[in-house]
Amino acid sequence: RLVDIQQIFCNAGADADDPSSYYFRQTDDYIANCRRCGTDIIYRLGTSIEHSNERYYSYPPDDYEKWADICIHIIRHYNEGWNNGFNWNIRYWEIWNEPDLHDNMWNADLEEFIRFYGIVAARIKRRFPKLMIGGPAFCGLNEHQLRLLAAECRRTGAPLDFFSWHSYTADIGWMLEQPRIARRVLDECGFPGTELHLNEWHYFNADWRQYRNDRLYCREANRAMDGLHGIDSAAFLTSVMTGWQDGPITMGCYYTAGLCWGVFDKYAVPYKTYYALKAFGNLTDFPLRRRTGSDRENVRLLAGCDPGGNAALLVSSFKNAEPIELGISGADLSAMRLLRLDCELDLEPVEPEFRDGKLILTPTASSNVWFLPGIAAGK
């Protein structure tokens, strides 16, 4: 909530051009902490979701032009040093969040939001033509809503440098299909250069209503091995990111690092999903992609090598109980290391099993992730 407009510009009636109308201190510290972690920033201009009985900020601004001017001053603070600010070159600026979640995020109809987006995005882009202005972080991918947004941008000349949306599902196929649908629709609407940002996503195999209202159900959905943080979620995570390598998506942002939806518990102990992200991150040390293939929809492989010729392989097995026979050509199998992520092991070494020159991966849980780091080339 520290990035919310009302946190920085607390008095909506104040002068938008007066530096004293802005309070940046906490937001400055928050973003500085993110940058110290080496994280690039995507700044959401708007307000946070309101789960309270009353709604305080999830309403359309009274003056769209003034609201855009406030955003411009915030961008100036972080990119141009205005008002004791910084030169951080934050490139991505997202307008609003989940406007189709009407009660919690936008207490007006969607058509009014789209009009608001057109006014604000165009005004910001005129001032900062080199920045990426986009949004609006729809709750899910809805082709009709996307076409409405694209039509308004074409009508007004407003930018749609990136289109963002969210997704919570346990369906890998749907996660891979969404970017393809978004790309097709945007191309048809005349926006072939618009980036695709699925910038809030997570494995979710529960019932939303029960999850929000039944405490025991919610606890089980969070703690179980087939729940939000368990081995199924971990294998889902690596399966999705593997599949995205062959699709049109520009950026995917996993939700999130902290507590309930995150990769650590309240004691900072990592969940299974942490180790899945770690394995995928380690694979990026081998950036030259190598060809892989699988004859099973629920088993996905991703391989790469480094400039020295050493390779690595990530194997994601989502709800698969059958052993996997893996042939690896041109590799020295005698020195192979195999790490396994399952219900018991957290990306820890296990003894490789070979049969007829193939590596045999035997599932030990409903889902598994294996990582083979630093596979040396054969002689």
Which residues make up each language-model segment?
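Substrate-binding cleft and catalytic face of glycoside hydrolase catalytic domains
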Residues: 1-170
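Hydrophobic residues embedded in beta-strands of well-ordered beta-sheets
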Residues: 22, 309-313, 359
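Structural beta-sheet core signal
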Residues: 43, 95, 135, 198, ...
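Noncatalytic carbohydrate-binding groove/subsite architecture in carbohydrate-active enzymes
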Residues: 109-237, 247
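Aromatic/acidic polysaccharide-binding cleft in carbohydrate-active enzymes
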Residues: 202-300, 307-308
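Carbohydrate-binding surface patches
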Residues: 295-333, 341-343, 364-371
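Solvent-exposed beta-strand/loop surfaces of large extracellular or lumenal domains
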Residues: 340-356
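C-terminal beta-strand-rich structural cap/linker in extracellular carbohydrate-active enzymes
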Residues: 351-379
